[in-house]
């Protein structure tokens, strides 16, 4: 039947997701709290913390310090909708995960995917850099829903 063949193809797609990515087969909203951070490193600025010397400026994402050239991985499957230089963010890649959810990856050394490309959970999409004026190599990482910034640590697990 058509329903069982659709179910089989959905199961095949889910089985192609790396086992280390438990949220791979889930819709983005259902994967909340189950996705890994896109890079291993030390969180140097958290969502909502003061940015620079101005108390009015707050971080709308995370800044994760990591070695130059470290691979940055997609936290969930999606389509690349932006992959270019953006003032203040350096080399920035944005993934659209559907239903208004975006993940943003900035200050990269290199971008490994182009606009229009579909990526799988865990796929390497960029490498850590300090483009856009950072003093040390770090990844800017943010999640947005319909334009609203969300706390990435509510969506991603800190790896042990």
Task: Give short role names for the model-derived ranges.
Residues 28-30, 107-108, 129, 138-139:
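Short beta-alpha junctions and helix-cap segments that line functional grooves
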């Amino acid at each position: 039947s058509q329903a069982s063949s659709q179910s089989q193809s959905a199961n095949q797609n889910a089985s192609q997701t790396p086992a280390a990515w438990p949220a791979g087969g889930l819709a983005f909203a259902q994967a909340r709290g189950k996705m890994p951070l896109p890079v291993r490193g030390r969180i140097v600025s958290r969502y909502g913390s003061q940015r620079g010397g101005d108390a009015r400026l707050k971080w709308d994402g995370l800044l994760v310090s990591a070695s130059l050239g470290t691979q940055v991985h997609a936290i969930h499957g999606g389509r690349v909708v932006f992959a270019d230089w953006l003032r203040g963010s350096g080399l920035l890649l944005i993934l659209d995960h559907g239903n208004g959810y975006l993940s943003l990856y900035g200050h990269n050394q290199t971008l490994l995917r182009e606009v229009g490309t579909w990526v799988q959970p865990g796929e390497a999409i960029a490498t850590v850099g300090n483009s856009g004026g950072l003093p040390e190599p770090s990844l800017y990482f943010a999640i947005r829903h319909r334009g609203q910034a969300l706390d990435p640590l509510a969506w991603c697990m800190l790896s042990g």
